[in-house]
Amino acid sequence: MTFYNHKAIEPKWQAFWADNHTFKTGTDASKPKFYALDMFPYPSGAGLHVGHPEGYTATDILSRFKRAQGYNVLHPMGWDAFGLPAEQYAMDTGNDPAEFTAENIANFKRQINALGFSYDWDREINTTDPNYYKWTQWIFTKLYEKGLAYEAEVPVNWVEELGTAIANEEVLPDGTSERGGYPVVRKPMRQWMLKITAYAERLLADLEEVDWPESIKDMQRNWIGKSTGANVTFKVKDTDKDFTVFTTRPDTLFGATYAVLAPEHALVDSITTAEQAQAVAEYKRQASLKSDLARTDLAKEKTGVWTGAYAINPVNGKEMPIWIADYVLASYGTGAIMAVPAHDERDWAFAKQFNLEIIPVLEGGNVDEAAYTEDGIHINSDFLDGLDKACAIAKMVVWLEETGVGHEKVSYRLRDWLFSRQRYWGEPIPIIHWEDGTSTAVPEQDLPLVLPVTKDIRPSGTGESPLANLTDWLEVTREDGVKGRRETNTMPQWAGSSWYYLRYIDPHNDKQLADKDLLKQWLPVDIYIGGAEHAVLHLLYARFWHKVLYDLGVVPTKEPFQKLFNQGMILGTSYRDHRGALVATDKVDKRDGSFFHMETGEELEQAPAKMSKSLKNVVNPDDVVEQYGADTLRVYEMFMGPLDASIAWSEEGLEGARKFLDRVYRLITTKEIVAENSGALDKAYHETVKAVTEQIEGMKFNTAIAQLMIFVNAANKEDKLYVAYAKGFVQLLAPFAPHLGEELWQSLTASGQSISYVAWPTHDDSKLVENDVEIVVQIKGKVKAKLVVAKDLSREELEKVALAHDKIQAEIAGKEVIKVIAVPNKLVNIVVK
């Protein structure tokens, strides 16, 4: 039987594409543009897994489709190659992280090329290349000049095992680090911060302008966390000190019975009484060991200590005890809250625990039993009594402003971005600190500030990066003799990925980040595909940098990525025992369609789970390509289900995709291909062209492949295949299975040219119309025959055709036909006696 020999065909076409630079980005100014971007990978030692090609295949299908439609297509690939794993590996083995990274990149590139993706490799970038990070550093100097990069002494999330501080976004809900799962503690350190908060409102508002999944927009909205309320100033009794509280409910001020400061609040030490000093100091020490997430966990027991001081409630002059508690964060709002225990669950639990006063100021509920958190008419609130929420807030804000103790305020949950890392393997921050107390950015002509090669890359332990050990690099002298030290912190891995999509547009430019005309031509990115796990971090940071570059006049668009799509996760096959515990695949015996634990004999339940080394269910694409071919892997991953669904890997599904490609190969290479069109496949072909075109546009790749299967089934029923339909079908197939597409195109055309730029087929609407219909013929209401007749045949003609049919002739022989009822396009009913 004829089959598709992937081992011969696929390498042949990969070599052809490379030798001919088939996918070089188009530059014809008269054509429309299409920029298809993948989230570039971190080149890990493990190499590519089968989850990577899912998103890559989707952008590749779109890129191949758009080239055939006459677009200039920019479809690049590169490497997000700084980061902790390479550094950790280097420390464990004594090897240079740059060598390790280069080896990993070579392996990734080999694997990617084996899958037939149409990348323009002339545009390959690597975030660890000094010619690339020169511009990462240049962007940092611009942030510094604009006052958007600054140094601050801040409590950081310190991970002793990693020897570095990490951003809030990198701390898991259980208070451990995202990388490594190590304990995170809070400690104050001098850090570089980026003022992303200056862009909070624009980052929020401009989400309306992009075509992104609503779930991702919501995650960003929640992270930015805009709330409108009021700042209220509270005086500390018997002192000249005061503090400010931000509240979204200034209308409940009459119910504020105590105040809580963050343990780190600047006022704490100066207002604490002698009697309470020891308890306060001990509480502060304990709080410093916890991460923000651990401190604000709603489920944890409320703890706190009274300072011994009182605040004065400005609205009624009542004394409010001032406490410190770790659930209030110095970095959020003003680091102080007014507690209204009658109407806030956390305040209520705290008040009950420490026997503090609870005064209801909204009608409804029983505050002895629980906090009442619904809306209600105001009570116990003097001039607000009888008002609803909106009216009461407005009236209280006016009162606060008239009496000078507060004002309306918009607040954001978003914090400034902690940008420095105490590691070696990252971009050096281009700042010099001089002994006269000033700091300056390294001038543009001296960039890149190259990361020095060193064997000693262990964290210094002092909170500085290993660069602090390299005195030759570290110490500099100005022309006027003033000595200085280079900044020893490096940038986080997020830096290089915050702007990489811009460098693809002009990757070899050594004069500027990218040429302005080229940026204008290619931006924004038309489709960006990657995992939803980057919803907040990477996507928010990239939008922030893009807006800064927009303000600097570097980029012409407000937003970088016009359309975003998150592919689902490919899950591995896994097995669970009766307790629900997962069992590694090498401990499972398959018998008669059931699964058993090899050691215990227990029958196991098959269940999809995330692929992991421990479960031994990670599928390596190299193995799939070797056994089934790259086109099979591509078609299978696109046919598994909707692109955004998470679906379990299945060997049977892979075999099904392979069988389909073999059927296609046989159809085109063994069927008689003819120059005359019999018309038999008109409807099937034009339906397929229309459906596949629409489904690729809508990224419904699974239904597009289903439609290709329908055409193959229809074509196999015919003796001959019209050459134009054979060619058109191969063109529709090519974005999904490009190696097979090229091979079959040559067998049909012998052109020696790639199929890549052949104009995409179009459908003819008139061919979609049915010219024939099937009607039933009944005798006394029972179906006796089915006929295919011309559509809209008249009653008289229909009657003639029905009565002339062999079966009907036999049925009515010797009988008298009383009546014939003919309904065009439906049926003929014959009444006999």
From Swiss-Prot:
Catalytic activity as recorded in UniProt: tRNA(Leu) + L-leucine + ATP = L-leucyl-tRNA(Leu) + AMP + diphosphate
PROSITE patterns: AA_TRNA_LIGASE_I
Positions contributing to ATP binding: K613
GO molecular function, one term: leucine-tRNA ligase activity
InterPro entries, sorted: aa-tRNA-synth_I_CS, aa-tRNA-synth_Ia, Leu-tRNA-ligase, Leu_tRNA-synth_edit, M/V/L/I-tRNA-synth_anticd-bd, Methionyl/Leucyl_tRNA_Synth, Rossmann-like_a/b/a_fold, tRNAsynth_Ia_anticodon-bd
Keywords, sorted A to Z: Aminoacyl-tRNA synthetase, ATP-binding, Cytoplasm, Ligase, Nucleotide-binding, Protein biosynthesis
Extent of motif 'KMSKS' region: 610-614
The protein, known as: Leucine--tRNA ligase
Origin species: Streptococcus equi subsp. zooepidemicus (strain H70)
